[in-house]
Amino acid sequence: MVAQFPRRMGRLFLPVSTVGALLIAGVAAFSVRAQIKTVSDPRERHFANVRQLTFAGQNAEAYFSHDGRRLTFQSQRDGYDCDQQFVMGIDGSNVRRVSPGIGRTTCGLWMKKDTRVLFSSTHGGDPACPPKPDFSHGYVWPVYPTYRIYSVKPDGTDLKPLFPRTLKPGEESGYNAESVLSPDGSHIVFTSDRGGDLDIWTMNSDGTKPRQLTRTLGYDGGPWWSPDGTKICFRAYHPETAEEITEYKSLLKRHLIRPTTLDLYYMDADGSHVRRVTNDKKQNIASFAPSWTPNGKGLVFASNRDDPKRRKFEVYKINLDGKGLERITFGDQFDGFPSFSPDGKHFVWASNRNGKEPHDTNLFIAEWIP
């Protein structure tokens, strides 16, 4: 999730918020001329009846409820300086904020039977927006050490800390975010630094019995359960050279990572049999926000692979064996955070297309044509 709102910067153009949500400073503005004043492109052959759901500001990470009738999403609407969590109907109606309106939040998804929403927030450590990272060290993502996992009812009431459930006075929670509920509702997968590195963990859905799945040095994040719950996909950066390892460890001590290259992986749900889907490190390609195709045989994700300057992101589909790569969107600025409805009939994503202002990121939904 680490991850959120797209803007252009240097060699890399990524969404902004934390790690699935990124913060960008020193941003070069798009010209108004560059704005795309259409909601679809004829080359987007998998889409029918594309509809725009939000119409201003920064909106991203929309995910379907289990009954397919509602969406969670994060936004800086209503004057918030930091992302907050919202729910709405799949037609864009009945928008309601469910997070407390303080701190920074990320990665909101539905829990079993759609009775609660799962998300991470920094508000328990400090109600103010956390500081943006220092970009004098180059492009980096913040990994805030006050991200704690919460659940809340869809009407915004009954907010409860889920992990860590309790903290001593003055104790930081550590980074705990990018959480997703398993299809059967029994477990949550998430990214945490509780083991000293950014690894993927699982726990019971009540926040008990955390278990570490990945152990390779580097950032493992954005985990997502396969439709049958037997596998987990994720994005990763694993430093290899002495220089890369030194830089990674130095940044991590300051709660930062440098995401200029990210590859996609998947593994069995117990952390075994890790397999690599993309191998783009030498090309400085970043692929992120993976989620599964409805049949569980492939992934959809965002990547800057078709832009030589690595600034523009589009949505792609790929088989688990790394073959069958197909570009899905042609927004020509930023398209990302793709996700299917539970029945596989609809597709939602975030895009810069058709924005009122040069930096607007909005949510779009389409009927999916296989």
PLM features per residue range, with description:
Residues P15-A28:
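Bacterial N-terminal signal peptides
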Residues H66-D67, K112-K113, P183-D184, P227-D228, ...:
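Residue-level detector of Asp-centered blade-edge/turn motifs that repeat once per structural unit
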Residues F55-Q58, S75-Q85, P100-R104, S120-I149, ...:
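A flexible loop/linker signature enriched in serine peptidases of the S9 family
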Residues G89-S93, K153-T157, N204-T208, D268-S272, ...:
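Short loop/turn segments that connect beta-strands within beta-propeller blades
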Residues N49-Q52, S93-R96, T146, T157-P161, ...:
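Predominantly a core beta-strand signature of beta-propeller blades
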Residues Q35-A48:
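Blade/loop signatures of beta-propeller domains
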Residues G68-T72, V117, I188, I232, ...:
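Hydrophobic beta-strand positions that form the internal "hydrophobic ladder"
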